A protein has these predicted regions:
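An N-terminal assembly and electron-transfer interface module characteristic of large anaerobic redox
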Residues: 1-210
Length: 210
């Protein structure tokens, strides 16, 4: 386009303004993050009424096997971020320290551990879990954090151990993780008390690739 042509530049300006207006309207129609989170946590907190299971899972853990069985995944790390954003973290961290946890520990872990004992935080605590799923591909803290919560709620804990792969992965690592996925599915079956729906898992897996 010749930028010295006033007519052409005006046409481009009108077009870009129109596109920006359409995009603005699209965002206004979309539900806000607050709305989405409200629906999500309402669904999770009503799980006992609707007969569904709740799993607390690390943010890097494989969530598709849970969703395929109708289990509602809940993320304590996200909850820790919400507590911090709501400026409620200091008090909960101090409570965790009074319980014997070092102030050197991750503030997300401290605030979540303390929150579980008082149903505090911005949403009155997370819904009680039926199981915990911990994958160590995110950090080392989650291992002891989730062990602590599993003991507190007296629920089963599954730990998925993933090898560090800095430059691709070896076949041995793939087989090792795959064998754990088989154990993970058996774990979910045991907690849910029903056979696994592999057809639904295939559907959920395909959606994750979109």
């Amino acid at each position: 386009m010749n930028q010295s042509d006033p007519g052409a530049m005006k046409t481009l300006g009108v077009y870009l303004f129109g596109q920006a207006k359409k995009l603005s309207l699209k965002f206004k129609k979309a539900p806000t993050m607050k709305d989405l989170m409200m629906v999500y946590y309402s669904e999770a907190k009503s799980a006992k009424v609707t007969g569904r299971k709740v799993a607390w899972i690390t943010s890097g853990g494989p969530v598709e096997p849970l969703i395929a069985m109708g289990v509602i995944p809940v993320y304590p790390e996200n909850h820790g971020a919400m507590i911090g954003a709501s400026k409620m973290g200091a008090g909960l961290c101090e409570k965790a320290e009074a319980m014997g946890y070092s102030n050197d520990l991750c503030s997300y872990a401290r605030s979540d551990i303390a929150c579980a004992t008082v149903n505090g935080g911005p949403i009155g605590g997370l819904p009680r879990p039926d199981m915990l799923v911990c994958c160590n591909n995110i950090c080392g803290t989650v291992l002891k954090w989730y062990e602590t919560q599993a003991r507190y709620f007296n629920v089963p804990l599954f730990i998925l151990d993933t090898p560090f792969c800095h430059t691709g992965y070896f076949e041995e690592a793939a087989r090792y993780v795959r064998s754990q996925i088989d154990e993970y599915i058996q774990f979910i079956e045991d907690v849910c008390g029903k056979k696994y729906d592999f057809e639904r898992l295939r559907e959920v897996g395909l959606l994750s690739f979109e």
